UniProtKB/Swiss-Prot annotation:
Localization terms from the record: Endoplasmic reticulum; Endoplasmic reticulum membrane
Assembly with partners or alone: Component of the oligosaccharyltransferase (OST) complex.
GO cellular component terms, semicolon-separated: endoplasmic reticulum membrane
Keyword rRNA-binding: no
Family named by the database record: Belongs to the SWP1 family.
Location (main, coarse): endoplasmic reticulum
Protein name (database record): Dolichyl-diphosphooligosaccharide--protein glycosyltransferase subunit 2
Signal peptide start and end residues: none
Length: 36
């Protein structure tokens, strides 16, 4: 059970990491759009 929880946590961290990257790219794109 502990192993499953750890694996589950890693999956969540990975998903959050991807989300953060997408959010950053979206903000960057928005700023570029406004500046352009």
């Amino acid at each position: 059970n502990a192993i499953f929880s750890k694996k589950n946590f890693e999956t969540l961290s990975e998903a959050f990491s991807v989300f953060q990257t997408l959010k950053y790219l979206a903000i960057l794109g928005g700023v570029t759009f406004l500046a352009g």
